């Protein structure tokens, strides 16, 4: 260290305290990176890698330290690229003016930017939240905390029991965190860390146990959210407080600034929102499509017609967290109904919110201290629109909308304060001046006058001095040696005042200076620096004043966001001819002329065929749906699930009429794919998902099961499908509402033997050798699968299709006899060689009502093995 320059010693000391971050080290107008940081940054940012001496004596090139740099004023774009790749960036600033510093300039970390703590607009999707997550798990409980520091909103929940990790993973689906801080117990859960890194592309950090200590967690929660917030947390499960405490500790360590805007804590318990696992979210394509991972083609794409970024985020949060309270659901869809019924108010309200901007994130940046003049101008422009929004809300007669109107503060005083101080079109940077409005501050105006009219100011002084002294030939000049001076000819030498100080004698006269002239010279020469510094001082004062009103602004922003989301629901309902659903706790799902909300929008030039649905508590609880591939079975089942989910969001739904009994969870088992990275086959993935469903579903759940058992042999698959179907239908085991699509036509016989089960099929019309899918759900089971006809529609060569028909005919003729013979032969073997008693004893000993689906499958495999 003794051989290092003072600057390099300073750098290494700061780097030692931030080993996991790329250190942006401020040197003049650049952020410099050194050594391994430089190598990494040059690679990731396409920067030229150079080198410099790091000691007091010159070194050979191979011993010099690698370095690269970026202009400080362009840092946001570079930081955004690093954050997008999952890196942390520590910003080290000069803490004093280098020109005034005595010796080495003081430097320190002002903040650490991470994927979950980024606030720069360039790094963010304005229609999606950016959550940092804190997770605490021990042997009995689990807590999960989520915070978006750009808006100041925090959410917290906790779980107990053996399924606590699965519940936490499901919560991740609601928030899609960008970064997660885990205690040791959470970090040891491979399923959790795997979901974070693989499903959410989330940066994961093991925070150890130190960050999650309960006493410190309670202290931090009390400091950040107040005593009442701490008391609202469950006393019997400290995991919630510890998860939030770990998150807050991480924020305090990395942000090093005022975080007072983080003041909205929402603690929720299991049972407040519909729980959706990652499989259901993916299969229902709630926020992105399965194949392209795009918003277009998702349910969010259909529903989001919001006009503000905060409204878009609010609507998305409703989609991620459908409600379970009938009262809360009806309250929301009542507000939507009021907007649907009043076209003029709805359209004027929408117009008033158009271009209103992102008040939530604006106030976040203002409190954070990173907002510029343009942010202030944007906030002022948003405030100017608030009276029109409030006026339209006040005109509507709905309880929730009236509450929103009352919560919406027009913030006139804040808008006037900003308008008085900030010009209409401020420059990008507040470090270069030019954004304080003329007339706001006398000193700024005076300095600007000097800057704009330096010659004019000198001329004014010259005229004043001529008049005061009576020296007609007096003139003020300038040179690089003396600066400004007063020149008087010899003929007026006797009239020179005593306050003039002689500086130079010429042939025809003399040159003088005065204190007033020197002061003016100083002002002219330093006016630019002084006005920039003064403008920044005035701006920081204004920013602090507006920061003090953060809660008022946040409350109004929340009211605007909810209003925007409700208006979007209403606009979509009117445009797409949706109906207001009747939501209750009856357990009944009754839909008349239901439509798939996404498919009908994609098929712009085609008529979508609507279908009815009835699922009761006792009758028609389970629907067995048969029919050919491509006929629309999966679309129909997804349609029912989406209509239920939309209803519980508080939205209108695509149907002529709908009655929705609230469901606690929606499960889906649709399609199949190998999970090679986990070493799982298609069938294993299918069985794992089915197992999860049967273990976690309740009688109040909605199950969407498509082609269970198709990943194995026909008899094995049919046995598993039947066992699963019976388990779902039987009220003693589950009794959940289930849509069960299958190609095993033999299962349709269960309609006559399994209570609550009914058959449906997709209507098909044949025309010669061709088939036409009518897309209509009708009672009864399908008589055949039309597999070869579907293959023909898919474009298989005619020769292949004809050969398939011939093979099918042969199989039908042969197996029709051989299958019966095989059954008889098997019966004889089982009774003779193995013995009737062994098989029957095993069947007598088993208790079907207590068997899990997996145990039932294992028993079937065991008996089958004995019979072979």
Where are these regions (language model features)?
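Short, amphipathic C-terminal "tail helix"
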Residues: 372-375, 848-868
